[in-house]
Amino acid sequence: MEQNTVLDVRDCAVVLDGQTLLSGVSFKVCKGEALAVIGPNGAGKTILFKALLGLVPFQGTIKWGEGLRIGYVPQKFPVDKTVPLTVREFFLLKAKRFWFPDETFLEHLSHELSLVGLSQEVLERPVGELSGGQLQRLLIGWAMVDHPEVMLFDEPTAGIDVGFEETVYHLLQRLQKERNTTILLISHELSIVYRYADQVLCLNREMLCHGKPHDVLHPQDLTRLFGEGSFYKHENSAHRH
């Protein structure tokens, strides 16, 4: 595995209950890069992330760099509203895991929460009382609080108000520039892919294209992904194919 390579995937496939959910996926991600994964619903995007994290059995080879800390923000995170766990207690579970002194960790946490638009007041609120958008911000903060080298985001702006979406994507850029974080991102927004991704991986149960967005996202590729008559945005222009 090359020194600058964070992730090397070769001929990855996922078969569950006799059904092939993903096949023929190969790509590499280098340190500090942003890879966007796109495709229609049911294309295997989330399944790929679960395979990368070892949450589902897979065929082929998935190699991570040694000793990497990995943060993961799922698209959905069910919360039992009856569990009396505050945001502070939720994060202190992670402090125990990484052996941070509680007070030092909470000082650091306040800064990380501010990056996702949450104030210190949220620390005393029960997790089950947070709105969908607040919970999504909380999960982003949870994933990045221990400064992982790699972060996986499954549609990070799902459930977040439109006004905060740009803040999230600017945050991802900031993590890249200031912490050299490697970003893997599932998105349905092609305008975001063009603006923020170094690489794009196109899935529809198999790998249809992979490379720099401007090099591989041609109308015929998007038709194969999303079907005839679909709309997509490319920079400031709207195209139909």
Task: Identify the function of each model-found stretch.
Residues 151-154:
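Catalytic Walker B motif of ABC-type/P-loop ATPase nucleotide-binding domains
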Residues 126-130:
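Conserved ABC ATPase signature
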Residues 147:
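Conserved catalytic motifs of ABC-family nucleotide-binding domains
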Residues 187-188:
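H-loop/switch region of ABC-family ATPase nucleotide-binding domains
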Residues 215-241:
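ABC ATPase nucleotide-binding domains
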Residues 104-122:
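Conserved ABC ATPase "signature" region
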Residues 200-213:
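H-loop (His-switch) and adjacent beta-strand-loop-beta switch element
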